[in-house]
């Protein structure tokens, strides 16, 4: 494969950003700072454990008592950890389904400029994050790849990638998959020590009050404007091609042909329809018998809804299973960090 240098295209590091606006230059400085100095989120969790343990001992707690408290709480969030992992998987399988790919293709045709495309990605990322942070992360990332294929946009790939994370970085905590709101709304997921203090706090008091909705609207509006203003111009934009990003990979992998009789059910929608009918029937009863806000605040109901939708959109069990296999690595942070949060609690 020809390198960037071989093709005669400038490398990102050689781009002159002196013509950019003050906001764009500030964004580039913060980008360089974050890339060079910020460690993985796991490191921050370990630092939090260290700081909390140190302050506990400074307040007179014996080291072995601190260790016992940490160990006793380590698995207190295990149910919630599994639930949040399913949130990531459910969002991924829905976003990577064939119908979602067609929707992404349609959305990618809408922007008319590179900077406009960055702002558009920011809007899509934040709006979808109100439904699911897992859906937002994958859907927006796939949208960036499709937009990057449009040579007429000359979109800055770095800015678009950052915009795709705005849902996870700015608004997801105001949406249905908010870990804090979901945790407080589900008594079975809360550690007993926390439940005794706070009790159960439903979505009607966290996500759906008018104050929260206004905050979400203002935050989304300001973030879209900032994404538009901070995006590099078409002259200085670093495109995906300049970064040697492979854009030929398709969003939805084609299923290989059946090679053995045992694969027939994996490629048939029969079992999908049966399972979705059962799950969908339960979901309909749940929403019919309860306040919709109360029903969706149940994390098990929320996860079942996304899994059933993912199964239906993928249609064939093999396609669904392939999507789940690709989604599992995205749960690594949840699986290893949440027990540490439990140890702190």
For each predicted feature, which ranges?
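C-terminal TM-helix exit segments that contain a strictly Trp-centered aromatic cap at the helix terminus
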Residues: 52-56, 170-180, 342-345
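Aromatic-anchored segments of alpha-helical transmembrane domains
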Residues: 54, 126-130, 166-173, 279-284
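Membrane-core helix-loop-helix motifs of multi-pass transport proteins
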Residues: 143-238
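Hydrophobic transmembrane alpha-helices of multi-pass small-molecule transporters
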Residues: 1-88, 208-221, 225-337
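Transmembrane alpha-helical segments of multi-pass small-molecule transport proteins
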Residues: 118-123, 157-165, 304-312
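Alpha-helix boundary/capping detector
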Residues: 56-60, 116, 129, 173-174, ...
């Amino acid at each position: 494969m020809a390198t960037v240098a071989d093709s005669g295209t400038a490398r990102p590091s050689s781009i002159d950003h002196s013509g950019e606006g003050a906001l764009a230059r500030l964004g580039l400085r913060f980008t360089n700072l974050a890339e060079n100095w910020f460690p993985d989120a796991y490191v921050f969790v370990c630092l939090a454990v260290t700081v909390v343990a140190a302050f506990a001992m400074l307040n007179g707690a014996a080291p072995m008592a601190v260790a016992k408290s940490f160990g006793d709480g380590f698995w207190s969030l295990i149910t919630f950890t599994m639930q949040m992992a399913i949130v990531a998987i459910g969002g991924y399988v829905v976003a990577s389904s064939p119908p979602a790919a067609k929707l992404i293709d349609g959305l990618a045709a809408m922007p008319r400029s590179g900077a406009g495309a960055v702002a558009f990605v920011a809007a899509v990322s934040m709006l979808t994050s109100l439904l699911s942070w897992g859906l937002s992360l994958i859907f927006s990332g796939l949208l960036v790849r499709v937009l990057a294929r449009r040579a007429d946009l000359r979109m800055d790939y770095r800015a678009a990638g950052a915009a795709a994370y705005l849902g996870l970085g700015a608004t997801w905590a105001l949406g249905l998959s908010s870990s804090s709101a979901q945790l407080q709304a589900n008594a079975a997921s809360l550690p007993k020590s926390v439940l005794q203090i706070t009790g159960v706090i439903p979505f009607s008091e966290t996500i759906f009050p008018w104050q929260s909705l206004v905050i979400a609207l203002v935050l989304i509006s300001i973030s879209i404007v900032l994404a538009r203003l901070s995006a590099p111009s078409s002259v200085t934009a670093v495109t995906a091609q300049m970064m040697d990003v492979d854009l030929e990979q398709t969003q939805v992998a084609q299923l290989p042909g059946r090679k053995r009789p045992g694969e027939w059910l994996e490629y048939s929608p029969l079992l999908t329809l049966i399972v979705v009918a059962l799950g969908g029937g339960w979901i309909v009863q749940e929403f019919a018998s309860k306040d919709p806000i109360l029903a969706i605040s149940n994390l098990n109901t929320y996860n079942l809804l996304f899994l059933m939708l993912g199964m239906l959109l993928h249609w064939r069990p093999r396609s669904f299973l392939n999507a789940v296999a690709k989604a599992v690595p995205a749960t690594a942070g949840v699986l290893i960090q949440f027990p540490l949060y439990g140890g702190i609690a």
